[in-house]
Amino acid sequence: MKVIALFFLFAFIFCTLEVAIVEAGFGCPLNQGACHRHCLSIRRRGGYCSGFFKQTCTCYRN
């Protein structure tokens, strides 16, 4: 029973790290300014880091 619990714990941690690597971008989660500048560069009004642990750069609509 303990082996199964440890397996699921490691699987959960691995999946969480994989999601973080895939979704992190444009400065998020540590540099919200980079996300904002990216959004400005694609002709949006700006942007911010949102989502789970602020890992997704979300741009404001024009």
From Swiss-Prot:
Keywords: Antibiotic, Antimicrobial, Calcium-activated potassium channel impairing toxin, Defensin, Disulfide bond, Immunity, Innate immunity, Ion channel impairing toxin, Potassium channel impairing toxin, Secreted, Signal, Toxin, Voltage-gated potassium channel impairing toxin. The keyword Transcription regulation does not apply. It holds the Pfam family Defensin_2. GO terms for biological process: defense response to bacterium; innate immune response. Disulfide bonds join 28-49, 35-57, 39-59. The keyword Disulfide bond applies. InterPro entries: Defensin_invertebrate/fungal, Scorpion_toxin-like_sf. One of its GO terms (molecular function) is potassium channel regulator activity. It comes from the Eukaryota. Highly expressed in non-venom gland (hemolymph) and moderately expressed in venom gland. GO terms for cellular component: extracellular region. It is found in: Secreted. Gene3D superfamilies: Knottin, scorpion toxin-like (3.30.30.10). Its main location: secreted. Residues 1-24 form the signal peptide. Belongs to the invertebrate defensin family. Type 2 subfamily. Antibacterial peptide active against Gram-positive bacteria (including S.aureus ATCC25923 (MIC=2.5 uM), M.luteus AB93113 (MIC=2.5 uM), and the antibiotic-resistant S.epidermidis PRSE P1389 (MIC=1.25 uM)), but not against Gram-negative bacteria (including E.coli and P.aeruginosa). Also has weak blocking activity on Kv1.1/KCNA1 (8.7% inhibition), Kv1.2/KCNA2 (10.2% inhibition), Kv1.3/KCNA3 (9.0% inhibition), KCa3.1/KCNN4/IK (9.1% inhibition), KCa2.3/KCNN3/SK3 (46.3% inhibition) and Kv11.1/KCNH2/ERG1 (16.9% inhibition) channels (tested at 1 uM). This is Defensin BmKDfsin5.
